[in-house]
């Protein structure tokens, strides 16, 4: 087999290559190492097709100085930065997924093999929130085989643009349930993003997994700053001010204390 566009030394099915490499029989083949490129074509719910910096089964990439995307970023593995972990973190799920797919080839009986669950986040996958706001997310998942499902929420903090994510995950309530909540950090700035992922895994043969990534974009920091800048300068000590502000949709409450 001759592949158009490949270099001569990569034409491993050519007559010349087979003559110079007698250990290969005529119909043997070599599996090439471009699996990660193919994995980007699979809709896993991680949304890596939208942006290479998000990360997914095909790895996670950063923008290099020449503007091209390359594997120059790392994910944390055992507390250390590891550029390969952007890919290897998914290997168990990938292997189980393709093992289950191989079972589909053995029997035409649907019930004889495992199938991937589906999951959607009720609130949507692109949200906006203000610093200090509590976000609650509900995962609605089903399994075509009726398998039991395990839920795990986690923050893909290496993919965040919120600078505080360098310190690790934001605290979450309900990480191992279908409903999770967290508070947007007070120091988050307008435009910062926080990536939350729900992983749903079934208990069938070759456990199959599906994900849904929710990206929370921070908005409202400037509104909060404006609110405090426009408050009257003089207030009675220990007075409690409550009400609403025309430039901000949420009600506010704060205490003025004497200095």
State each model region's role.
Residues 1-138, 142-168, 191:
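N-terminal acidic, glycine/proline-rich low-complexity segments
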Residues 112-125, 149, 214, 222-229, ...:
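Proline-centered linker/hinge motifs at extracellular inter-domain junctions
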Residues 120-122, 155-189, 228, 238-240:
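Low-complexity "stalk/linker" and mucin-like segments enriched in Ser/Thr/Pro/Ala/Gly
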Residues 127, 139-145, 157, 186, ...:
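Extracellular acidic, Ser/Thr/Pro-rich low-complexity tracts
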Residues 127-133, 235-257:
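Short, solvent-exposed loop/linker segments at the N-terminal edge
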Residues 178, 202, 211-213:
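Extended non-globular C-terminal regions
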Residues 206-221:
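C-terminal edge beta-strand
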């Amino acid at each position: 087999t001759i592949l158009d566009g490949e270099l001569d030394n990569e034409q491993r099915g050519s007559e010349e290559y087979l003559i110079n490499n007698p250990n290969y029989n005529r119909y043997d083949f070599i599996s090439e190492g471009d699996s990660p490129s193919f994995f980007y074509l699979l809709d896993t719910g991680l949304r890596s097709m939208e942006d290479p910096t998000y990360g997914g089964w095909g790895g996670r990439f950063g923008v290099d100085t020449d503007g091209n995307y390359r594997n120059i970023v790392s994910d944390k593995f055992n507390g250390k930065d590891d550029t390969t972990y952007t890919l290897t973190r998914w290997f168990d799920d990938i292997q189980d997924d393709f093992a289950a797919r191989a079972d589909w080839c053995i029997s035409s009986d649907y019930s004889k093999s495992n199938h991937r669950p589906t999951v959607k986040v009720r609130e949507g996958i692109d949200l906006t929130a203000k610093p200090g706001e509590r976000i609650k997310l509900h995962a609605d998942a089903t399994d075509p085989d009726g398998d039991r499902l395990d839920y795990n929420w986690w923050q893909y903090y290496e993919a965040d643009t919120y600078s505080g994510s360098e310190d690790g995950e934001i605290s979450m309530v309900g990480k191992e349930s279908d409903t999770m909540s967290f508070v947007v950090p007070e120091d988050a700035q307008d435009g910062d993003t926080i990536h939350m992922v729900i992983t749903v895994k079934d208990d069938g043969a070759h456990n199959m997994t599906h994900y849904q990534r929710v990206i929370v974009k921070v908005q409202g920091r400037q509104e909060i700053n404006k609110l405090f800048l426009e408050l009257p300068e003089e207030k009675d000590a220990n007075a409690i001010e409550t009400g609403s502000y025309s430039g901000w949709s949420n009600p506010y409450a704060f205490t003025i204390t004497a200095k």
